[in-house]
């Protein structure tokens, strides 16, 4: 990469407030012209230039990211322990993108995607471009071909751990093979997706390794390249189980934005994952609306525009699932309050 060159220059201290503002504006504009918009963050922790967003299908996550969804033209990493809900988070984005008329490719390197489950979440399997590569190199070839078209809004890669280099499959095992492949591929890919505004979600796992004096350390496969090139990294954590009597019907899931280059990081929204149905949009929207004052709560009863929605959060979910017009009105008003389109 060509390194920026600096010409010799003179400096002086500015005292006039207006001169300072103008000088700062010129400096930030110069930097963004050379290195791209969104390089500079404003006082609210948001990129100084508008970043287009691809809705995640989870409103509270859109809020946590800060711009209304995943930033377009960027790499995203979803990582967490086994069965934490990573694939479900990704599939919610697939369904939302398709609902909005977008095109999606799903790279199933693990050969484990349950199509029926994906359809339950709203994924249209008949219009989903689905691929199952044998090697990491094959996967990246497919990704690059999809990006090259400029037609895809979202590409999901499931998962990084399954992107095994061809040489390793052939029996030639050397330390750092996968990390080297990831570094080489991602360094070339990051600029291309910025041009096509494609979002690529990489699903990754947390693994425990022994380090130091037998200390247990958690890490993610694939080396450090994905951590570096991702604009947003989200850790998916399982939480409290949701029960209906003695039956466990779901669980609470925390989505922790451990890295965020388009807004402030370290947000931790908690969402409800209903087994078989995914994250409840009704509960998610109502919870967000309650925080904004769009929905009112008196005791156990929730209300919207003077109309009772139900008793308890699951009562509200039941009501809204049978009254889509009320849900759509609530969803739209909540997004307006958040200044999301």
Swiss-Prot record:
Name the residues that span the membrane: none
Query: What subcellular locations does the record give?
Result: Cytoplasm
Respond yes or no to whether keyword Signal is given for this record: no
| The keyword RNA-binding is annotated on this UniProt entry | no
Pfam assignment, any one: RecA_C
Top-level taxon of origin: Bacteria
User: What biological-process terms (Gene Ontology) are attached?
Assistant: DNA recombination; DNA repair; SOS response
Keywords from the named record: ATP-binding, Cytoplasm, DNA damage, DNA recombination, DNA repair, DNA-binding, Nucleotide-binding, Plasmid, SOS response
Q: Primary place of residence? A: cytoplasm
* Residues engaged in binding ATP: 80-87
* A GO term from the CC aspect: cytosol
**Molecular functions per Gene Ontology:** ATP binding; ATP hydrolysis activity; ATP-dependent DNA damage sensor activity; damaged DNA binding; single-stranded DNA binding
| CDD domains assigned | RecA
Q: Which family is this protein grouped under?
A: Belongs to the RecA family.
Q: What HAMAP family does its record include? A: RecA
Q: What does this protein do?
A: Can catalyze the hydrolysis of ATP in the presence of single-stranded DNA, the ATP-dependent uptake of single-stranded DNA by duplex DNA, and the ATP-dependent hybridization of homologous single-stranded DNAs. It interacts with LexA causing its activation and leading to its autocatalytic cleavage.
Tell me what this protein is called.
Answer: Protein RecA, plasmid
């Amino acid at each position: 990469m060509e390194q920026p060159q600096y010409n010799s220059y003179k400096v002086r201290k500015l005292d006039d407030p207006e001169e300072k503002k103008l000088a700062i504006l010129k400096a930030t504009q110069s930097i963004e012209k050379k290195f791209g918009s969104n390089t500079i963050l404003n006082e609210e922790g948001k990129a100084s230039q508008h970043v287009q967003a691809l809705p995640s299908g989870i409103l509270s996550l859109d809020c946590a990211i800060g711009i209304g969804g995943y930033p377009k033209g960027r790499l995203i990493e979803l990582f967490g322990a086994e069965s934490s809900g990573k694939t479900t988070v990704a599939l919610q984005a697939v369904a939302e993108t398709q609902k909005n008329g977008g095109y999606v490719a799903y790279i199933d390197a693990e050969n484990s995607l349950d199509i029926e489950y994906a359809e339950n979440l709203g994924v249209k399997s008949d219009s989903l471009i689905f691929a199952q590569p044998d090697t990491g190199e094959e996967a990246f070839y497919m990704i690059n071909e999809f990006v090259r078209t400029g037609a895809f809004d979202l590409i999901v890669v499931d998962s990084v751990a399954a992107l095994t280099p061809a040489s390793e499959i052939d029996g030639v095992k050397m330390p750092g093979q996968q990390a080297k492949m990831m570094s080489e591929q991602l360094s070339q890919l990051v600029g291309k997706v910025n041009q096509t505004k494609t979002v690529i979600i990489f699903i990754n796992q947390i693994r425990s390794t022994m380090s130091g004096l037998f200390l247990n350390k958690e890490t993610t496969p694939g080396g450090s390249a994905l951590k570096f090139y991702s604009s947003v990294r989200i850790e998916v954590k399982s939480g409290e189980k949701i029960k209906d009597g003695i039956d466990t019907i779901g669980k609470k899931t925390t989505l922790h934005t451990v890295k965020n280059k388009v807004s402030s990081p370290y947000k931790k929204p908690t969402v409800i994952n209903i087994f078989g149905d995914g994250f409840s949009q009704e509960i998610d929207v109502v919870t967000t609306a309650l925080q904004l004052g769009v929905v009112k709560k008196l005791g156990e009863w929730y209300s919207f525009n003077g109309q009772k929605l139900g008793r308890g959060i699951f009562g509200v979910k039941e009501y809204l699932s049978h009254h889509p017009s009320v849900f759509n009105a609530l969803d739209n008003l909540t997004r307006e309050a958040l200044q999301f389109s």
